[in-house]
């Protein structure tokens, strides 16, 4: 991972090799983006469990969905309206009266880079969000993409859209 500068695809074959060779439980890690992906990784590698990381920023319901899947229950399907509420909750969590609002907005955008991977397939939300300079401007962007024109009822995809990059510095 380090030698590949964290940009190479996950080597699930090597995880499977470690599972076969190890006498202790092995957990799989790497791009566990959805319940379906977690299940696929478990089946493919034979790992004893999976670690879910940054994709839980994009989809904070991921752990709930995994528990529901494991229990054989119907899996919660968040909507774009749920995502809009999540953004409000994030903002409230990050608010700090001591820090300048501009810095707080920048910190929120770090999270939104991940959330935005599943908002629209063309990356329009991410582009507009990244260019917003004031909280009110950001909330207008969020409302446009997540709530207006009936979008609040649309399902929030389980997987990021292909080619939509969370980290602008990694865009080709």
Residue ranges and their predicted role:
Residues 6, 13-28, 32-172:
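Alpha/beta catalytic cores of nucleotide-metabolism and tRNA/nucleoside-modifying enzymes
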Residues 2-8:
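Short, small-residue-enriched loops and turns at beta-alpha junctions
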């Amino acid at each position: 991972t380090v030698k590949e500068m964290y940009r190479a695809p996950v080597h699930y074959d090597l995880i499977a090799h470690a599972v076969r060779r190890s006498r202790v439980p092995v957990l799989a890690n790497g791009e566990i983006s959805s319940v379906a992906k977690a299940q696929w990784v478990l089946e493919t590698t034979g790992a004893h469990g999976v670690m879910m990381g940054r994709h839980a920023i994009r989809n904070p319901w991921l752990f709930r969905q995994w528990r529901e899947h494991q229990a054989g229950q119907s899996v919660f399907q968040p909507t774009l309206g749920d995502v809009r509420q999540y953004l409000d909750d994030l903002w409230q969590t990050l608010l700090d009266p001591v820090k300048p609002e501009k810095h707080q907005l920048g910190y929120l955008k770090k999270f939104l880079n991940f959330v935005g991977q599943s908002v629209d397939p063309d990356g329009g939300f991410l582009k507009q969000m990244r260019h917003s300079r004031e909280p009110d401007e950001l909330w207008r962007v969020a409302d446009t993409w997540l709530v207006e024109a009936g979008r609040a009822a649309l399902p929030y995809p389980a997987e990021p859209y292909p080619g939509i990059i969370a980290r602008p510095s990694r865009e080709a």
